[in-house]
Amino acid sequence: MFSHKKVQEDLSVTDRDTKTQKLAKITDIDKIRAQAHIHHAYFLGLQLMIATRKGPQVMGDWMFRVFRRLHEEKFLSSFDKLGLSHLPDAIACAQYHVLSNNIGGVGVEYMPDSNTKAWVRFRYPRWMYHGPTICGIPIEVSRGFLNGWYGHNGVSLKNPRLGFVCVSEDMTGEFGFCGYFKEFDYDLAENERLSFAQNETPPEYDASVQPSVPAAQWTQARLEKANRNYAMEYVRNGLCTLEEVIGEDQTKALGSLAARLIGLQYFQETKDALGGRDGDLHDAALYLTAMLEGMGDAVSINEDKASVVVIQQGLRITRDLSADQSELVFDCWKDLWVGALQSMQTRRSLTAFHQNKDHESATVRWLIT
């Protein structure tokens, strides 16, 4: 007997297989780029959220803490990895900021002046304030990262004569963030490690002296992962340090709201980048799976007619954080995906069950209905 139900089921399976095959053509690099993009947007959105809700002074304090924490975690270890330890300190610091930022997708130029003085100039568009975001960020952010990172290089290198001189900033409408590392001929007081000299201009750019990472070691895949990790680190550290400034409750409230808004806003863009569809439960699961795979985590799908469970193992976003920090970051970050699935034409509910929180085998079961 001819069965319409059987034909519909067969067509459903065929359609599902077709969608899965289409998504399978998307490369790992596509997934990694999608994750880098949405985490970059989340950090930008979080900055605007705090700037508009909490004001310039909170922003300055927060950014100081973000960059000091990143400096203490990354500077010396990355300094050695980039092979800069043999260079004079001013030269090494300038090259470090060019290399580390270029690896993260940020354009920075290097202009050596002497063994004791070397310039860096950040080129537009600025990653930190991409797009129109630059118009909503107060100058206190610039002062926060200058004091949090640039003015601390000499301390980390145990060179009391090394300081940073800023000649141009982004929010002042000059020619963008620019300045130089200089080893003075005297020990600097704490308030002298960072200074300003707006009347100075950098030397001309010379392409032949720009530092670069070894191409054999830094493949395209490794660079894409570094770009993703760069954005994710700003989100992780941003949320952890924000709690130090405005407290846990407000951080969770504003961090979650920013995440949900970015998820809502960026679903279509990231879905299209992954060749996905704005369709049924299976489409929602394929989208979420592809995005989470872009983090380098292991992901699988269990589904029935009424719901789908996406299982994520590894949870890179909370890796190496303390138990309290892990919970804070996850509680905010999960709303990226809650917002994304709410943005579908048929709105999908997403519930996260976070297991083994304090272990390397941390697992999340994402229930989609």
Identify the residue ranges that each predicted region occupies.
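Elongated alpha-helical scaffolds
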Residues: 145-149
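N-terminal accessory segment detector
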Residues: 1-119, 126-144, 155-176, 182-369
